[in-house]
Amino acid sequence: MATKRPSADQPSTRPLLDKLGVKPGSKVAIVNLDDPGFIRLLRERTADIITGKPRSKVDLVFLGANTFSQLRKLDDMKKWIEPNGGIWVVRPKGGRSELRDTDLIAAGLTAGLVDNKIASFSDTHGAMRFVYRLRDRPK
């Protein structure tokens, strides 16, 4: 018998870090994201966490964004990630931000990235992941 998949209306029960693709030993950069609870969770999974611009490539970047000017950092940040890495843009849900999903998608495309996943980051914030297209990944 096939297992029943949860409906889109039901929240995921997977742990947040699993949803975000943070694996043990992942290299992570955090920019403009003041969330002590999230950082505590990250430290339980990986010790390789940088605040700000990393000196070497990272697997994941978590960018807190509330404004268009913060989204413009995507073009520079794409140089920070491994070819198969990702940048999560975390922003307030609902009308608490000037940014809409379409704004994030457009900023990603302008930076040469595509969105490929969304996640509920918290009760108040959502996140959208951006990655290189397969054909555009640096060798």
Where are these regions (language model features)?
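Mid-chain, well-packed structural core segment of small domains
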Residues: 70-103
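Short, charged/polar "capping" segments at the starts of alpha-helices
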Residues: 35-41, 96-99
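Class I SAM-dependent methyltransferase Rossmann-like catalytic core
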Residues: 1-19
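Conserved Class I S-adenosyl-L-methionine
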Residues: 100-119
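Short acidic low-complexity segments
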Residues: 48-58
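Short, glycine-rich nucleotide/cofactor-binding loops
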Residues: 61-71
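Conserved class I S-adenosyl-L-methionine
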Residues: 20, 25-34
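Class I S-adenosyl-L-methionine
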Residues: 113-139
